[in-house]
Amino acid sequence: MEAVIKVISSACKTYCGKTSPSKKEIGAMLSLLQKEGLLMSPSDLYSPGSWDPITAALSQRLMVLGKSGELKTWGLVLGALKAAREEQVTSEQAKFWLGLGGGRVSPPGPECIEKPATERRIDKGEEVGETTVQRDAKMAPEETATPKTV
């Protein structure tokens, strides 16, 4: 359990800064979660599937017992875990796009889906063939679009 506490503490220090919970607070929270049967192993904490049940159980505990310490700690830990997970995804995508994936192929994200030609031209700042008047003529008066100025 000590290794998990160190990893979580490090992530919290990185992503929570001065509000980071102490190792003692993290350890107490993990012990409570194991005692309550929400974690079979401390490493289960890394699984996003366990996050909602943990949040619900700690919220219920706060309402029944009025104890908010573990919920506050969990909120900080959860924020750090989500940030670390997002950063890892971003890092993996960057490696894939740069061809540094080491043979591991990841599916492209939604931003890699081919855009229609008109959207590509808009992204590049070119004019689109359809004018505002033509677009407005297709819409009902209450749906008239106001062109955005960039």
UniProtKB/Swiss-Prot annotation:
Q: Where in the cell is it found?
A: Virion
Ranges where the record places region Disordered: 107-150
**What is a single Pfam family found in this protein's UniProt entry?**
Retro_M
- Predominantly, its location class is virion
Stretches of Basic and acidic residues bias are at 112-141
Q: Which keywords annotate this record? A: Virion
Q: Which GO terms describe its cellular component?
A: virion component
Q: What else is known?
A: This protein is a product of the Gag-Ros or p19-Ros polyprotein.
Question: What domain notes does the record hold?
Answer: Late-budding domains (L domains) are short sequence motifs essential for viral particle budding. They recruit proteins of the host ESCRT machinery (Endosomal Sorting Complex Required for Transport) or ESCRT-associated proteins. Gag contains one L domain: a PPXY motif which potentially interacts with the WW domain 3 of NEDD4 E3 ubiquitin ligase (Potential).
Q: What is this protein called?
A: Core protein p19
* Gene this chain is encoded by: gag
